[in-house]
Amino acid sequence: MPASRPEFSLLPRPGKVSPRPGRFVLGQDTAVRALPGAEGAADLLRTLLGPTTGLPLSPSPDGRVVLALDPQLGGLGDEGYGLTVGPQALLLRAARPDGLLRGVQTIRQLLPPEALSGGARGISWELPCVEISDVPAHPWRGAMLDVARHFQPVSYLHRYVDLMALHKLNVLHLHLTDDQGWRMPVDAYPRLTSVGGHRAQSLSDGVPHSGAYTKAELRGLVRHARERGVTVMPEIEMPGHVRAALAAYPGLGNHPERRLDVWTRWGVCDTVFGVHEEVLDFCRTVLEEVMDLFPSPYIHVGGDECPTTEWEESPAARSRAAAEGLDAPGDLHGWFMGRIGSFLVEHGRRPTGWAETGGELPPEFTVMTWRDPEHARTAARRGHQVVTAHHRATYLDYAQSTDPDELPAQDGDPVPLHAVHTNDPVPRGWGPDEASRVLGTQAQLWTEYVTTPDRIEYLTYPRLCALADRAWSGGRGDWAGFVERLRHHTARLDALGVRYRPLTTRSLAAASAGTARPPR
């Protein structure tokens, strides 16, 4: 791709770009013709470009901007598209609606960066003539945002989705509950947010922290994301990482008589759910309300970092293990996840969970492996669908360098830009059957030390640009080409007001990642 021309410095990199002579100019009289099924993409085009360019882009059967949905188009899959820009007309085609939405983002990037910001005067809204054929390498290209440790307003989640969509990412993994906070309202259990949504402080700072979304806000977020081709996958942690839930409803724990606070520390809490039937009823009821809010085919239920000490010491848990024919109380973890997974499958959803080894979740689970790349292969060999999330390449809560002026971040070696871009969701040497089970990859941003949107964006960008580029383009990657395109792409980030970490010679160096393995 001719990245030396700024208008062709597209990110992520399209599959095939063939420049043509000439320019196509959008003007006040430029109209949009949306063929049947393409109306949503046309609406998005107007929503994104109208306020910033001042162009109406009115619908018309004679419009020179044509959006066409053709299910018979071969080789494009669910998200591929073809874009032809000529001097007199623009044609965007796809086999599925999401493909048109991806093409709309490419049109945005072909325009001057001012088309993303608004307020510019005297700009000619021109696109270079070009032919683009583009299909993603992986169907899962995600970003996980932890709003349990530090709550973020729903208005910022809308912006987060907008930035994801610009980079053709398609799954927002929303981490809604943890030991330190519960952010989703559950009508059947109102104390989850009235009590579990508040903690006295973070570590020893003495500053209370609170927050919860309304169901209307979450429905609005899902709708906003869907209009941009992004699925919101909720995560409700269980059977560990549940201290906030136990603060609200102590009877769900292994010591019902004990009164707990919402946890104020970070790390792994040894307080976990009990395994009595009331706990399973609670989980099923919560998940029913989750499924009512989130149409995502995947529902994440956490599952990792669950100490079994309380079960080993609990007569009730030992009795449950014996009654279920388990060898030891520690085996209750797999039993618990199996019960929850079966419930989600019965409701037409795909249970998803974190895996510490790749082999501990029931077979119906889609597995996110984070500790070691080899665990992804273990899970694939067991027949799981896999989303690779190796912490040394996808955890954006680690610093981007060892520079002393970096913002506070998770303890551990840095995860530099190069480590993110060179991470292949399907490492070389995997067999075809193993590789076919990898859905893709995603970034993670745990927010123990990330308190504000400014810090979120500093830690996220430009590293999320790197992950988006590799997840969409696949292959062995082109670091030098990515760096060249990224230099131009920062003008778009500037136009959008993204508070990204500035590019430096050091950050663009091809250095290897560290090897430490701190907890998530």
What are these regions (language model features)?
Residues 2-138, 455, 467, 471-497, ...:
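Contiguous, structured surface segment used for ligand recognition
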Residues 40-41, 151-153, 179-185, 239-245, ...:
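Flexible loop/turn segments at secondary-structure boundaries
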Residues 44, 99, 156-159, 213-220, ...:
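Generic recognition of stable, solvent-exposed alpha-helical segments in well-folded globular domains
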Residues 55, 169, 228-230, 349, ...:
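Short glycine/serine/threonine/alanine-rich loop segments
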Residues 76-270, 275-280, 284, 288-298, ...:
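Feature activates predominantly on carbohydrate-active enzymes
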Residues 245-251, 255, 260-364, 370-382:
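Active-site neighborhood of glycoside hydrolase catalytic domains
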Residues 351-365, 370-520:
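Flexible, acidic glycine-rich loops studded with aromatic residues
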